[in-house]
Every structure is written in C-alpha cells, then in structure tokens.
Design a protein with these regions (language model features):
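Short, contiguous strand/loop micro-motifs
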Residues: 9-11, 61-65, 87, 113-114
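Small/aliphatic-rich secondary-structure junction motif
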Residues: 1-57, 132-135, 144-183
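Gly/Ser-rich helix-loop-strand patches that form or flank binding pockets
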Residues: 20-29, 99-145
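Short beta->alpha connector loops
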Residues: 13-14, 93-97, 117-118, 159-160
Length: 183
C-alpha cells in the first residue's frame, strides 16, 4: 500500500511555499504524482449601502483578481516542484471545497492547510472536505514545511470510520519514534 497520487491544496490567501514543500516532501517519500490545486469563488452578492446586490462590474473585477492570484500560485508551484517529481496543476474559479472534493477522486491523499475557514468563497471548509472527499486529508499548520511524525497518538473508537482513518494513516506510521494509544 502506498500513496500514488497526492493533491496539495494552495489556499488563495495563504503563502504557498510551506504547503508546496510539504507536498513535495510527501511525493518524494512515497514516489507519488503531485497535483497542485487552487480555487476561489466570486461571491454572488456584493454588500452596498442599499443591502446585498448583484453587481456585475464588481464581480468581474473580483474574478480577474482571483484569476491573477491563481496564475501566481501556479507559477510558485511549478517553480518549486523538482523535475524528479511528476506533477500537474489544476485551478478553477469556483467553490474551493467543491473543486477539491471533486478532484480528490483521483488522489490517494489530500494535503491542505488549516486556513481561514470563515470565507467559504476563498477557503476550503475542512469539515465538509473531510466528510465529503472520501480520501484521507492531512491538515497542516500554515507555516509547516516538513512532516515530523516522531510520535503518533491514536484516539480510538471502534467504528468503521475510525478503522478506515487508521488504515489510511498507516503509511505515516512506518518510522515514528514512538506510537502511543490513550488508555
């Protein structure tokens, strides 16, 4: 058992380098194909003094800004990924959670930052992603560049979901210094 395809989600409002570095490290460790992914959605309503309205010109400006940022993220991803790692890029101007959930069907592991989940138009909803993707999700701190699984703690509940989560995480447990289980 191994991860053959890893998706790394680049949040539109976060620095991309740390999460890309984690993705590269995991792809090299498992010999996996790395997919860089980014998405953001234009909010359909714009707040004005008269309330929430549809404003086509403002929405187009926001879409242009999103497309520009997606191009910047792609450039960083392509610059950072070494030629020894096979990779590809995917982006969309749509819901980041929905896009990542759909793209996850072609991956064995999803790597994403914890991000700012308050803006569903610009950040992934971790809860919805975890429940809807059907794939293991590794959530990293925003500034984390390396995976250090020295100690693994297993909180166990004898359910199908818990057994699946433990099975999905087994690859990370090959080399921890200690493995603990709460009593």
């Amino acid at each position: 058992m191994s991860y053959k395809s890893i998706i790394v989600n680049l949040a539109i409002d976060e620095a991309p380098a740390p999460i890309v570095q984690v993705g590269i490290e995991l792809a090299e460790r498992f010999g996996a194909h790395l997919v860089g992914l980014a998405a953001a959605e234009v909010p359909p309503l714009v707040p004005t003094g008269e309330g929430m309205v549809y404003e086509g010109e403002i929405m187009q400006i926001q879409r242009t800004e999103i497309e520009k940022r997606l191009a910047e993220l792609r450039a960083v991803f392509e610059r950072m990924v070494p030629v020894s790692v096979t990779s590809e890029w995917a982006q969309s101007v749509c819901s980041p959670t929905r896009f990542l959930s759909v793209m996850a069907r072609a991956a064995d592991l999803i790597v994403t930052g914890c991000g700012d989940g308050d803006n569903v138009f610009r950040a992934v909803d971790i809860g919805s992603l975890t429940l809807g993707a059907g794939r293991p999700v590794l959530v990293t701190a925003g500034n984390m560049e390396h995976i250090r699984a020295k100690t693994v703690l297993v909180a166990w509940k004898d359910t199908r979901e818990a057994r699946r989560a433990v099975a999905d995480a087994l690859l990370f447990w090959k080399r921890p210094a200690t493995l603990s289980s709460p009593r």
